[in-house]
């Protein structure tokens, strides 16, 4: 079943390649959405796709070298039409 999640990540998530790794992992799982750095050292993301793909994506992201996720604030939001996962500046 398709789902969309809005997520705030905190921890060591900026300056460690988080956005680029998230983009690579999301594209490899055919997920759509976006990711961006926030001024308060957190990262914000919306990710959409099959629920099992989103769960595996988040597990893979937590297992990446240099990235240390201390907390994820996640909410389910309505799906939207989009065709790719991208970094937002």
Model-derived features with residue positions:
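Intrinsically disordered, low-complexity, mixed-charge
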Residues: 1-89
